[in-house]
């Protein structure tokens, strides 16, 4: 079985003071900076020499630019992407969550709960009818049923949930357009 693993520079970092998707002043990027960011999103293992050749800059200039992009928070950590099916987590569930209360303490308690659950790999605070949208990866429907009934709905901040099972993933990328 072939496992596709890619390395990339992630935008945002778990536990950072500014989470991905949080509004902040965008960095001023010129054409070379944009090519660097795009190249590193495709392959974070590129050596500085290969990156410089790819983007059409000198090695020294490329190194300085990467360091500046890191300092500006444009480039953060380097991670490996894992095929969820290859590790037995091939079922994707999108779960809408409604909170019992919108008090800051209830939201913070729920967000701490989410941070502590490894099967919840993405979480968004939402506007509209539902308060949160979670992406959850599990082994099978029974695994999700246990998580939903015994864990999620048992949390004191949760009033209700609506689950949607992905039949297939038709697009997946971690690359942010620059």
Question: For each predicted feature, which ranges?
Answer:
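A compositional/biophysical signature of low hydrophobicity enriched in polar/charged and small residues
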Residues: 1-178
């Amino acid at each position: 079985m072939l496992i596709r693993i890619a390395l990339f520079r992630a935008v945002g970092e778990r536990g950072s003071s500014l989470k991905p998707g949080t509004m902040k002043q965008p960095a001023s990027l010129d054409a070379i900076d944009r090519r660097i960011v795009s190249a590193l999103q495709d392959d974070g293992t590129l050596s500085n020499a290969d990156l410089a050749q790819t983007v059409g800059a000198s090695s020294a200039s490329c190194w300085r630019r990467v360091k500046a992009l890191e300092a500006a928070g444009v480039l953060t950590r380097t991670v490996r992407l894992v095929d969820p099916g290859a590790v037995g987590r091939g079922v994707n569930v999108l779960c809408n969550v409604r909170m019992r209360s919108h008090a800051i303490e209830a939201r913070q308690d729920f967000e701490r709960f989410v941070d502590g659950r490894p099967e919840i790999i993405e979480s968004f605070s939402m506007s509209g009818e539902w308060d949160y949208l979670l992406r959850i990866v599990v082994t099978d429907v029974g695994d999700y049923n246990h998580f939903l009934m015994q864990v999620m709905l048992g949390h004191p901040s949760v009033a209700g949930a609506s689950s949607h099972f992905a039949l297939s993933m038709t697009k997946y990328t971690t690359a942010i357009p620059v």
